[in-house]
Amino acid sequence: MRVAIVNDMPLAVEALRRSLAHDPELSLAWIASDGLQAVRRCAADLPDVILMDLMMPVMNGVEATRLIMAESPCAIIVVTSDVLQHTSLVFEAMGHGALDAVDTPVLGRGDPKAAAQRLLRKIRNAGWLIGKKTVALERTTAMASSDTDAALVVIGASAGGPPSLAAVLRALPASFPAAIVLVQHVDAAFTSGMAAWLNEQCVLPVRLASDGLRPEAGVVLLAGAGEHLVLGAERKLHYTTEPRESVYSPSIDVFFHSVAQHWRGRAAGVLLTGMGQDGALGLKAMRERGFFTIAQDRATSAVYGMPKAAAALDAACEILPLGDIAPRLEKVFAPPANPLFN
């Protein structure tokens, strides 16, 4: 894969160059010292992956990400010093389509190869996405529905997800009768901050999903990172390392499949903006189980990858612009029960 570096600090550039050298499948495409240079270089020579700094002269990484994803879209990973000190900027960049974020490796500290591994792992994950490689998951066998009135909304998102999730949650009232579980591709370092940030964006309470917790009406749970979130037969949430071959942990497909298999009440699945195909097969499984499913439309998706894959599989009952998703969910779960679930 051809990787470009966008960073104005010579030491950071050298650290990134040395990190890339540890993987023979990676080559350096070009280096830009500010966001504007990166936008122009992408227009002339599009790399497979961009390692984008945030704080740079002329044009910062957030604005550069926005312009690149609008004009010459490719996989972008935010790589900056101390990402936790720039959480709001990271979420803003992800809102424009950046896939992930990681600290810049530091020269002269510990084993250089070990220090590079976290960055290289994220680059490889991006490679899986742009290569459109997917992990085959077994189709689930639907369990018979019970008479319970429990209602559940599950939402998956990746690149461009944080502001899209906020937009959906912000439009839902405090009286929304369904439990909500979110699966967002994000580094483990950001999950607590993202839950707190989303909690400030809406009237519904948002917190991290903990092992053994049951989804609760009117409460939003965000999947933690590093392991897959699944719904068990007893309707409790659990974390698991299987399947290990999945590109992202948590995987949207893994969670959606578990919902299709074990949830016995009413449910709706929503697949938002994101690169790759994660979630498309799981959304299809939910639709085949009889649940209502939505995919975000092309026009309002920061990255039209996952929703596009869902549309191609006929996994979505409806394809909607972002602003119409929350009102549709309100109608679906409004009393009396929607005929779609009868």
Swiss-Prot record:
Its EC number(s): 3.1.1.61, 3.5.1.44
A Pfam family hit: CheB_methylest
PROSITE patterns: CHEB, RESPONSE_REGULATORY
Signal peptide per UniProt: none
Gene Ontology biological process terms in this record: chemotaxis
Keyword Cytoplasm recorded: yes
Disulfide bonds: none
GO MF annotation list: phosphorelay response regulator activity; protein-glutamate methylesterase activity; protein-glutamine glutaminase activity
Entries under PANTHER family matching the protein: PROTEIN-GLUTAMATE METHYLESTERASE/PROTEIN-GLUTAMINE GLUTAMINASE, PROTEIN-GLUTAMATE METHYLESTERASE_PROTEIN-GLUTAMINE GLUTAMINASE
Full protein name: Protein-glutamate methylesterase/protein-glutamine glutaminase 1
Upper lineage: Bacteria, Pseudomonadati, Pseudomonadota, Betaproteobacteria, Burkholderiales
